[in-house]
A protein has these predicted regions:
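Pre-active-site segment of Zn-dependent metallo-hydrolases
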Residues: 14-52, 57-61, 75, 111-119, ...
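Glycine/small-residue-rich loop that forms an oxyanion/phosphate-binding "nest" at active or ligand-binding sites
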Residues: 49, 57-114
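Short active-site oxyanion
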Residues: 4, 64-69, 133-135
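Binuclear metal-ion centers of metallo-dependent hydrolases, dominated by the metallo-beta-lactamase
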Residues: 69, 81-94, 174, 178-226
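Active-site environment of divalent metal-dependent phosphoester hydrolases
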Residues: 30-31, 52-57, 77-80, 94-97, ...
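Active-site neighborhood of phospho(di)ester-bond hydrolases with catalytic His/Asp-centered motifs
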Residues: 23-26, 43-51, 71-74, 135-139, ...
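Active-site-proximal loop/helix segments of hydrolase catalytic cores
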Residues: 113-179
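Zn-dependent metallo-beta-lactamase
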Residues: 1-21, 28-31, 97, 104, ...
Length: 226
């Protein structure tokens, strides 16, 4: 069965597969490029890579409305639990087999603090195995050589930031593709703010010229079936 992915802008994706609906980093309210409002999305699980407002976003409000389980690092799980929400906490390198598939937390070189400035735990990326397909959502990170180890899992889809300034930019993202060797790449985390303006088509051309991967540039609201 295919995994259906919908890009909602910035780093946010909705995924349907394994009999569940997942939402990753739901920064919708306050996102000038968001394809939907927080009231329009559904979720059984909400994955939060770190506590910055442009990733934690509407996670709490959506979970309160839908009853979704929040999945993230231990500190984010405690934060969600303190608000009466169901949460599953992990740490980097740890994984868990959920009814729909497996989630494993990967390294991400970034920061993490809640909107009030309190410590948000270590940021992470997500390695998802759903319907037998391996999806790597790098979330906010700089380039790191251990991406090669992630690639050894056999990655069908890599979702990589290209915005620069807060994350790796297009040149380092291209190097990441060469380390991971995925089948398909989708660039994210660009154009939301002036400081991360990029041309994703330039990145796509470089990926397809220098690697075997196919690069898919999705506009907010567009979908892809894996």
């Amino acid at each position: 069965m295919p995994v259906e992915l919908t890009y909602y802008g910035h780093a946010c994706f909705g995924l349907k597969g394994g009999g569940a609906t997942l939402l990753i980093d739901p920064f919708l309210t306050g996102n000038p490029l968001a394809a939907v409002s927080a009231d329009e999305v559904e979720a059984d699980y909400i994955l939060v890579s770190h506590a910055h407002g442009d990733h934690l976003g509407d996670a709490v409000a959506i979970a309160q409305r839908t009853g979704a389980t929040i999945v993230g690092n231990h500190e984010i799980a405690i934060y969600a639990g303190n608000q009466g929400l169901t949460a599953h906490g992990l740490h980097i390198g740890g994984g868990w087999d959920f009814p729909f598939g497996r989630i494993k937390l990967t390294i991400a070189h970034h920061g993490s603090s809640f909107p009030d400035g309190s410590y948000g735990g270590n940021p992470c990326g997500f390695l998802l195995t759903i319907e037998g397909k391996n999806i790597y959502h790098a979330c906010d990170t700089g380039l790191f050589y251990d991406m090669k180890l992630i690639g050894e899992e056999g990655i069908e889809l890599a979702i990589l930031p290209i915005g620069d300034n807060y994350t790796m930019g297009p040149k380092d993202a291209l190097r990441a593709v060469k380390l991971i060797e995925p089948t398909v790449v989708i660039p994210i985390h660009y154009d939301t703010f002036d400081v991360i303006k990029q041309d994703p088509t330039d990145f796509a051309r470089a990926v397809e010229a220098e690697t075997k991967a196919r690069c898919l540039v999705l506009k907010p609201g567009e979908s892809y079936s894996l």
